[in-house]
């Protein structure tokens, strides 16, 4: 094989590989919730404080009202793992009825009586005519010693 043929093959393979890279890249738009702006915050929860006693048991939850739109719900899954969710119903703009109430592992919005699973954030009873429904807005919850740090 001549040097010219080998050179052309390498150039062709390089061009083919580059074209493959460009074509395999897709622009997926992350669908943001249009009703809830995302605030940046970091909030440590000291589990030794009495106001957070409900978080010491699996299935326990607390509402931290000074965070987010309508507060942040922190939920203890199994004693060692925590989830944090925005306490404002994600399927309409914040209003007087949009703060969700927690009962066991279900969060309910009193505006439309939407119910959300606190383990997944998913809407359990979507309306039949809805084109788009949003899950609860998730916040990070990280265990650090005797604290849980909730952040976004």
Model-derived features with residue positions:
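Alpha-helical transmembrane segments
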Residues: 15-19
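Alpha-helical protein-protein interaction elements
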Residues: 14, 31-33, 108, 131
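C-terminal motif of bacterial Sec signal peptides marking the signal peptidase cleavage site
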Residues: 21-24
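N-terminal pre-ligand scaffold of iron-sulfur
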Residues: 28-104, 117-118, 122, 137-152
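Bacterial N-terminal signal peptides that target proteins for export
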Residues: 2-13
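Short cysteine/histidine-rich metal-coordination sites, predominantly Zn2+-binding motifs
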Residues: 103-113, 123-136
């Amino acid at each position: 094989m001549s040097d010219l043929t080998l050179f052309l093959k390498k150039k062709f393979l390089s061009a083919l590989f580059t074209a493959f890279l460009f074509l395999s890249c897709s622009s997926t738009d992350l669908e943001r919730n249009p009703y809830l702006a995302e605030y940046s915050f970091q909030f440590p929860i000291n589990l030794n404080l009495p106001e957070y006693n409900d978080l010491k048991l699996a299935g326990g939850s607390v509402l931290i009202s000074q965070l987010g739109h309508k507060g942040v719900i922190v939920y203890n899954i199994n004693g060692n793992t925590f989830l944090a969710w925005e306490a404002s119903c994600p399927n309409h703009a914040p209003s007087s009825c949009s703060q969700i109430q927690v009962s066991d592992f279900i969060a309910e919005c009193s505006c439309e009586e939407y119910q959300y699973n606190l383990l997944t954030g998913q809407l359990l009873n979507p309306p039949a005519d809805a084109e788009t429904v949003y899950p609860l807005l998730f916040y990070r919850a990280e265990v650090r010693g005797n604290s849980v740090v909730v952040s976004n």
